[in-house]
Design a protein with these regions (language model features):
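Short sequence/structural segments immediately N-terminal
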Residues: 2-206
């Protein structure tokens, strides 16, 4: 009686490809994985789109609806002669992936926790925190060389004939890498905060 030889490597791989387990083939598992991945990509895209509107940012939190969003609606970034409107995410959220998703997740959790704690729940609390909050944003912008500003404003496309002498001088510094947008343009989308007179941190209102 001839000896039965075990199947070769190629045959074993072929069998495993179609039946890695008694219940599922590799192709079935791949199809399920692709389906889950597709739902994940579509779901993420929908979530980013829904949470990326100014209406969502400005009205979801009570404090934003009461204090932050109305200021933005009165700014030149909301109403202007050209009709070009900058949304909250245009200025505050990175425009590229995966940085956009990471920032939105971190900022969402941070803002939700602050809202639950009532950090800026009243006008008095908001004004007390305004300087600190503004500087946090300005520091972020300086770190990335005002990347979000430059996604709309291109210094090489600016007409020096339509700018003041000082603006032309400052924009030359910017083009040379010696300055960044936020060094000069603070208070363009929200009220300019007043620097605290006392260097020591004042007690937060209760």
């Amino acid at each position: 009686m001839a000896e039965v030889r075990p199947p070769g490597l190629f045959r074993r791989a072929w069998r495993w490809l179609f039946s890695p387990s008694p219940r599922w083939s590799v192709f079935a598992l791949l199809a399920i994985g692709l389906l889950i991945g597709a739902f994940g990509v579509i779901g993420t895209g929908v979530a980013v789109a829904v949470t990326g509107t100014s209406e969502f940012c400005g009205t979801t939190c009570h404090s934003h609806q009461q204090f932050v969003y109305p200021e933005h609606q009165q700014s030149v970034h909301y109403n202007n002669r050209t009709g070009v409107r900058a949304s909250c995410t245009d200025c505050h959220v990175p425009h590229h992936y995966p940085a956009k998703l990471i920032y939105k997740a971190k900022a969402g959790m941070r803002d939700a926790w602050a809202e639950l704690r009532g950090t800026i729940a009243t006008r008095e609390k908001f004004e007390h925190e305004r300087w600190r909050l503004a500087n946090n944003v300005w520091d972020e912008m300086r770190e990335n060389n005002s990347e979000n500003c430059r996604s709309c404003h291109n210094p090489t496309a600016m007409s020096s004939a339509k700018q003041s002498e000082d603006a032309v001088k400052q924009h030359k510094k910017f083009a040379a890498g010696k300055a960044t947008c936020i060094d000069c343009h603070t208070g363009v989308a929200h009220k300019e905060p007043e620097e605290p007179k006392e260097p020591a941190k004042a007690e937060a209102p209760k």
